[in-house]
Amino acid sequence: MTESSLDLQESGWEELRREARKIEGDLDVKLSSYAKLGARFTQGDTDLVMNYEKVLKCVLVSGYVDTGSPTVGSGRSWKSMEMEIQSLLEKLLDINDSMSRCAASAAPTTSVTQKLARHRDILHEYTQEFRRIKGNINSLREHAELLSSVRDDISEYKASGSMSPGVQVLRERASIHGSISHIDDVIGQAQATRAVLGSQRSLFSDVQGKVKNLGDKFPVIRGLLGSIKRKRSRDTLILSAVIAACTLFLIIYWLSK
């Protein structure tokens, strides 16, 4: 056993790695459950949208309402799971920092450096996945809570029995919802166009750079390009002189008549 390996064992490297692998396994399980919870929120949001459109149509056409729309969950399990995952990510970050200090104090080998980099990559992947799922769930919950407020408006309408202002509010809500969907489509198209233009710009820049490098590497080609440019300039001057002479000849001919 090498001296570097002994130093790593004495500094607790293997113990830290075991703890890191355990937390990584726990994170994998909890992130999977968290993603399934996000999928349930997606289904709930879709049901709310469909129910909202059905209720709105009934109110505007016949005045009949059915308030049996689904409710938004309390979110306790969602919030608890989110806090657990956040805590595990912070612990894994601390362990990775400890592993880095441990490896640095014992002259790490290539194998140790690769293992440390792998643990960092896993932490980065889990962090990005957690942020993505969290953002989706928050967005869906906000959307669902907004749509669930329609039930309150409908209940007030049934209690009052009047067509205004409840119906007007529902109409405005439907108009706003349609406008938001249209704006989202326009923004998506603009982002796609921007990405295409950016890729084309990068492609043209690469081509220009390659041509320049080719000219620098091969003087013969650079000289040939220069000759073509000079010939083009000479042809342009000759053509300009011919046009000027013809114009002058026409002016003299017109004045002499």
Curated annotation (Swiss-Prot):
Q: Which Pfam families match?
A: V-SNARE_C
Q: Where in the cell is it found?
A: Golgi apparatus membrane; Endoplasmic reticulum membrane
Q: In terms of one coarse class, where is the protein primarily found?
A: Golgi
One of the record's GO cellular component terms: Golgi apparatus
Membrane topology classification: Single-pass type IV membrane protein
Q: Which residues form a coiled coil?
A: 113-147
Question: Self-association or partners: how does it assemble?
Answer: Component of several multiprotein Golgi SNARE complexes.
User: What is the name listed in the Swiss-Prot or TrEMBL entry for this protein?
Assistant: Golgi SNAP receptor complex member 1-2
Species this chain originates from: Arabidopsis thaliana (Mouse-ear cress)
Q: Give the classification, highest ranks.
A: Eukaryota, Viridiplantae, Streptophyta, Embryophyta, Tracheophyta
